[in-house]
Amino acid sequence: MKEQIQQLSAYQPGLSPRALKKEFGLDIDLHKLASNENLYGPSPKAKEAIKEHVDEVLYYPETGAPTLRKKIADTLNIDENRILFGAGLDEVILMISRAVLTPGDKIVTSQATFGQYYHNAIVESAEVVQVPLKENGQFDLDGILNEIDEDTALVWICNPNNPTGTYVTHEELEAFLEKVPSNVPVLVDEAYFEFVTADDFPDTLKLQEKFPNAFLMRTFSKAYGLAGLRVGYVIATKEAIHNYNIIRPPFNVGRLSEYAAVAAFEDQDYLKEIQKRNAEERAKFFEIPESKHFFDSQTNFIFVNTKRPKELYEALLKVGCITREFPIGVRITIGFPEQNDKMIEVLKNFDFEA
């Protein structure tokens, strides 16, 4: 057993609604608003694709998700050999970390961002350098630049960031990439890209033309509503993808996952409706005075800053909403209107100054 494994723990999902009801003595329906899933679910066309092809599950899938790869490549007007798929972005992060990191290497990222960057680096005996976020919840790109040296093998930028929901602009990311050594890959994790409405959000595909070391990651788990089918991908140089492919398990994206992802990707009208609903519901949270305690969000969740996260978590639970507690606040997945209205009422009546 690797020694460094001993300092890690397996991923711990939140308690189930049944367990929470028992622990808190609740006799109400509970709704899971803790994992940033799209509660409206996937496109009906994705569901139909699953039904249509369900009898094919006795066969192994085509390796590398070739139909989906070509669909995305054609849509984005890029070489399909620049795309690698994983069973969600978790596996993409694992494959990249395994392919690149060696003992003595280091990764540089933020102190409060997606934990799988740290986790996989430690597994590979790499050093993890975490730069604190700015007070507004944004990545401190200057702070990250100051930590990059000859031992830096990977830089991770979650944009928009999970769990804060904040983002770096196109201008900020471009200025950052100008200063990063060209041999250091910068992984830009855009898992929540489809929820963004900000005009100055980076066009990372465009930036890749100037900065080939900027690698872009996206997923079907969030806006496309396919979290249970595990499909994520990275767009990088052909050389990098060739090397990552050596690490990729042979049949890592299942048949039904690929069929559903293709159908979901083709149904952009449904995606636009999801985007519209999310933007409308997100705006409701920021209409209340208490929003001064929230980080700005370009995602399908709200991060609420509070010195009393446990109390806020339990107050939201009492109105039937399971959220995610952090040391400095609570992350709330944007749900259906009636769920959001309940949570907004709790936030309006919560004592943030206690």
UniProtKB/Swiss-Prot annotation:
One of its GO terms (molecular function) is pyridoxal phosphate binding. InterPro entries: Aminotrans_II_pyridoxalP_BS (IPR001917), Aminotransferase_I/II_large (IPR004839), HisP_aminotrans (IPR005861), HistidinolP_aminotransfase (IPR050106), PyrdxlP-dep_Trfase (IPR015424), PyrdxlP-dep_Trfase_major (IPR015421), PyrdxlP-dep_Trfase_small (IPR015422). The keyword tRNA-binding does not apply. Homodimer. Belongs to the class-II pyridoxal-phosphate-dependent aminotransferase family. Histidinol-phosphate aminotransferase subfamily. Pathway: Amino-acid biosynthesis; L-histidine biosynthesis; L-histidine from 5-phospho-alpha-D-ribose 1-diphosphate: step 7/9. The modification N6-(pyridoxal phosphate)lysine is found at residue 222. This is Histidinol-phosphate aminotransferase. One of its GO terms (biological process) is L-histidine biosynthetic process. Transmembrane segments: none annotated. Keywords: Amino-acid biosynthesis, Aminotransferase, Histidine biosynthesis, Pyridoxal phosphate, Transferase. The gene is hisC.
